[in-house]
Amino acid sequence: MKGITKKLLVSRSLKRLTAKKNRRKIHRETNKRLKPEEDPSMVKRRQDSDSDSLEKEVSVVVTKTSDDEMVSTDTKKNYFQRIWSDDDEIVLLQGMVDFENDKGKSPYDDMTGFIDTVKNFISFQANQHQFTTKIRRLKDKFLKKWNNGVDENSLVNAHDRKCFQLSKVIWEPTTKVEEVGDWFVNSYLVGSIARLGVSEDVMKQSWSMVPIETKKEVEEKFKLLKDEESENLRLKTSFLQKVNSMIIEATN
C-alpha cells in the first residue's frame, strides 16, 4: 500500500514538472514570435517607465507652475511694492527745504539740480520721473490733510508727523502762491487744453511742476496774446461800426 502511494506521488510530481516545463517552453516560443513592443513584460516595463516619466513631467510642470507663480508673485510684488522707504521720503522733503534755503530758489525752478543734490542719499536709483511723481504725491497727501483740517499734533505716527511738518514748510498754502497761480487756473487755457483730452486735475498738478522761468514765459506770451485779441476785437468792432454807418447812409 505504501509502495502504491509513493508511486502516485512521484507520478504527480513528474506531471507537474512536465507541465511547468511545457509552460516555460510555450512562453519562450511566444516571446520569440512577439515583437519587442508586443512583449507583455516589455509593455509592462514601458508602461511603468511611462508612468514614472509622466510623474516626473507632472512634477516638473507643477514645479514650473509654482516657480511661475512665485515669479509672477515676485514680479507683482516688485512692481507694486513700495520702493520709497520712510527714510527716503524724509530725505526728499528735507532736501527740498535745504535746497531752497541754500540756493535761494524752489526745487521746481531747477528740478535737475535739486535731484542731483539728493539722489545719492536715496536707497535706490530713482529717475527724474520717479522723483517728480513722488513729490507730487507727497504734496497731494499733505494738501488733502491740510484741507481736512488735520493738525500735526493729531498725527500719532512719528513719520507722518515729520512728513507733515516738512511738507508744511514747502507747500503751506499762502495768498501769494494762490495769486501767482490764479492767472493760469482761471484762464481759458485750462478748459481749452482739457477739451483735447487732458484731465484738468492732472494738468493743474503738472503745471505746478513747471519751472518758474517757464511759467513766466508762458504768462508773458499769454498776456501778449490777450492784448492781440483785445486789439483784434477793437478793430472788428470799429469795422462793424463803419459798415453799419455806410448802410445807414445808403438807406437815407
Curated annotation (Swiss-Prot):
Disordered: region residues: 18-57
Transmembrane segments: none
Domain of life: Eukaryota
Biased composition, class Basic residues, residue ranges: 18-27
Coiled coil residues, start to end: none
Key words, A-Z: Transcription, Transcription regulation
Family the entry assigns: Belongs to the GeBP family.
Name of this chain's protein: Probable transcription factor At2g01370
Phylogenetic classification of the source organism: Eukaryota, Viridiplantae, Streptophyta, Embryophyta, Tracheophyta
